[in-house]
Amino acid sequence: MQILLVEDDNTLFQELKKELEQWDFNVAGIEDFGKVMDTFESFNPEIVILDVQLPKYDGFYWCRKMREVSNVPILFLSSRDNPMDQVMSMELGADDYMQKPFYTNVLIAKLQAIYRRVYEFTAEEKRTLTWQDAVVDLSKDSIQKGDDTIFLSKTEMIILEILITKKNQIVSRDTIITALWDDEAFVSDNTLTVNVSRLRKKLSEISMDSAIETKVGKGYMAHE
């Protein structure tokens, strides 16, 4: 597994790099924090670990840049205790968030869970689903409606796939959380809310935001 670790604290970087390499992860770091995207594009990571507080530009800036060109999973690290940092990271398309200090074994468990979730279908052939008058491409994380195409994050696509495969049925929040993360204890309820909100915002670009309905106190439903 190729990990790009964007961390300016060299002591922490070296400690994490050593721990991750013991699990056979190939870890790259950043030499010039003004050129993070250069390393990102040349290294082609399978997962990015991104610190919030960085020199020159913060992690949110680099997350936006990465999302312009890739759906690679991004896990944020932050020493700040502001809950809005977590909300912002989810809104920008991050897949997970950890606050410093943290247990390294928890980080490794999260990385392994993300990897399984995102890459378990990479060897499969193209898979598509028809939803209303749109075509959902599960292999490309995209939705095409007429001449318009939108792209989802891996997390958003998993949520949508669950809802579409149970069209016109209420899917509980717990069911979705269980499918997204291996250990529910590591997930806040707000994280799912943010991801669904972001999914609806993208669907609005192709006039499909009303296709997913919130059932208060129960969960969500995708209309056929």
Curated annotation (Swiss-Prot):
A GO CC term assigned to this protein in UniProt: cytosol
Subunit details: Interacts with GraX.
Pfam families, per the entry: Response_reg, Trans_reg_C
Family matches, as Gene3D superfamilies: 3.40.50.2300, Winged helix-like DNA-binding domain superfamily/Winged helix DNA-binding domain (1.10.10.10)
Tree of life domain: Bacteria
SMART domains: REC, Trans_reg_C
GO terms of biological process kind: regulation of DNA-templated transcription; response to antibiotic
Positions of the DNA-binding region: 126-224
Described function: Member of the two-component regulatory system GraR/GraS involved in resistance against cationic antimicrobial peptides (CAMPs). Upon phosphorylation by GraS, functions as a transcription regulator by direct binding to promoter regions of target genes such as adhesins, exoproteins, transporters, toxins, and proteins involved in cell wall synthesis. Down-regulates the expression of many genes involved in RNA and amino acid synthesis or glycolysis.
Ranges where the Response regulatory domain occurs: 2-115
PANTHER family according to UniProt: REGULATOR OF RPOS (PTHR48111), SENSORY TRANSDUCTION PROTEIN BCER (PTHR48111:SF27)
Name used for this protein in its record: Response regulator protein GraR
Keywords, comma-separated and alphabetical: Activator, Antibiotic resistance, Cytoplasm, DNA-binding, Phosphoprotein, Repressor, Transcription, Transcription regulation, Two-component regulatory system, Virulence
Modified residues (4-aspartylphosphate): 51
Post-translational modification remark: Phosphorylated by GraS. Phosphorylated by Stk1; phosphorylation increases the DNA-binding activity of GraR.
Annotated GO MF terms: phosphorelay response regulator activity; transcription cis-regulatory region binding
